Amino acid sequence: MLKPVDVAVLLYLLRHLRESFAHMSAMLGISKSSAHGAVTRLERAGLVHKLSEGGARVAHGPALEFIQFGVPYAFAPELLPRARGVPTGFAALGLSSEPDAPEPLALVWPSRLGESAGVGIKPLVPDAPDTAWRDPQLYRCLALVDALRTGDARAREYARRVFREIFEAARVGST
């Protein structure tokens, strides 16, 4: 059975095909055994293929379908009280400035490092607020996942379209 951290690992693997488990765990703020376990679960689910030389390749079609339509149901959002933290969903930096993006949602991952106020949401990865500073592209993907998990129909469709573009760019870049 997949765990929430597996979603972050899957999104990380889109751009980091042959990264070591040590590097992945440092970037995501998880243990090496958690990173390895996530890749094993993702492989069992048919969302990645382990490479003989190390690392894993994302199965783009199934992974995109899972992100777009499975994650919002498998990992329903856990809303928290108002908090100060790191913006997520459409309140995330860079997402609300898209020309055809829906109005931003005031969602934050609670964190002492954050400077935004809003409704708290439990992140898929406990270290997600710190991940925002370490890997801005992964932060954008995790924020889009939260938009899928919490947004209205228009917001979800916008997030799906952006994910299609991200997965297509990753597919082209990995060939």
Description of each model-found segment:
Residues M1-Y12:
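Short alpha-helical segments that sit at the start of domains
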Residues L13-H16, L42, V145-G151, F163-I166:
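Generic structural signal for hydrophobic core residues of well-folded globular domains
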Residues G29-R44:
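Short amphipathic alpha-helical interaction segments
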Residues E43-G54:
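A short, conserved structural fragment
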Residues E157-T175:
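Long, compositionally biased intrinsically disordered regions
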